[in-house]
């Protein structure tokens, strides 16, 4: 009985984590650059034959697939080509050398003249930040060129991500163990951004399915407990 309860509990815990992830997807369906994450499962079997197999969550993975695009008309909004990510500075000595990557292309210039994306300083293809004068007029070219008053001062830093990728918030990504970021020149579309890569409808369908699996695991736990209680009662009678 104990094995059955353990296996069922592992399944319920895994589905609970999945539901939390789906809820995050649902909340960020319209968040530019958001990337969904999913628990990674392994199959758990009780030693006793005849018991069902249940999944157990052992980690999480990031879904890098491209989301739907939305037209904004803002000339500083950029949509990198599929599979490309903008480079931004997170700190001077943090994880991955203080560099993270995002598809949140809502570029803006703060009060100090720093070009930012996802709230972080944007990096050029040379790994430098972009600092603008108060009267500078910035435009973005189709290949990511940074044009100030018509003169190119650099190019948006873009990379492709491979291997294990971890999230730092809704839209910031860094290579995990065995992962890497490779510099990659690419085109950008201006006046548009990418939304979350799981639609609200997809998330609601996923939630219904995960909830059913969670309920099934909880019912199995209840059934095993009742069987254990009955066995104890029979032992007392004898």
Indicate residue ranges for each PLM-predicted region.
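Amphipathic alpha-helical polymerization modules
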Residues: 1-238
């Amino acid at each position: 009985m104990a094995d059955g309860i353990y296996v069922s509990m592992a399944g319920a815990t895994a589905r609970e984590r999945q539901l939390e992830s789906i809820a995050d997807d649902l909340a960020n369906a319209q968040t530019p650059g958001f990337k969904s994450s999913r628990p990674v499962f392994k199959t758990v079997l009780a030693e006793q034959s005849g018991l069902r197999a249940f999944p157990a969550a052992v980690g999480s993975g990031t879904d890098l697939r491209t989301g739907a695009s939305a037209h904004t008309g803002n000339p500083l909004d950029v949509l990198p080509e599929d599979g490309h990510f903008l480079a931004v500075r997170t700190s001077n000595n943090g994880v991955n050398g203080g560099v993270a990557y995002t598809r949140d292309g809502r570029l803006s210039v703060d009060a100090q003249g720093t070009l930012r994306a996802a709230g972080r300083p944007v990096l050029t293809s040379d790994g430098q930040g972009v600092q603008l004068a108060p009267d500078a007029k910035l435009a973005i070219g189709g290949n990511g060129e940074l044009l100030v008053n018509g003169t190119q001062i650099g190019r948006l830093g873009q990379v492709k991500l491979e291997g294990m990728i971890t999230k730092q918030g809704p839209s910031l990504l860094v290579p995990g163990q065995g992962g890497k970021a490779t510099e990659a020149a690419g085109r950008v579309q201006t006046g548009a951004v990418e939304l979350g890569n799981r639609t609200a409808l997809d998330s609601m369908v996923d939630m219904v399915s995960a909830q059913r699996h969670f309920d099934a695991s909880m019912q199995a736990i209840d059934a095993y407990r009742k069987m254990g209680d009955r066995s104890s009662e029979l032992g007392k009678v004898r």
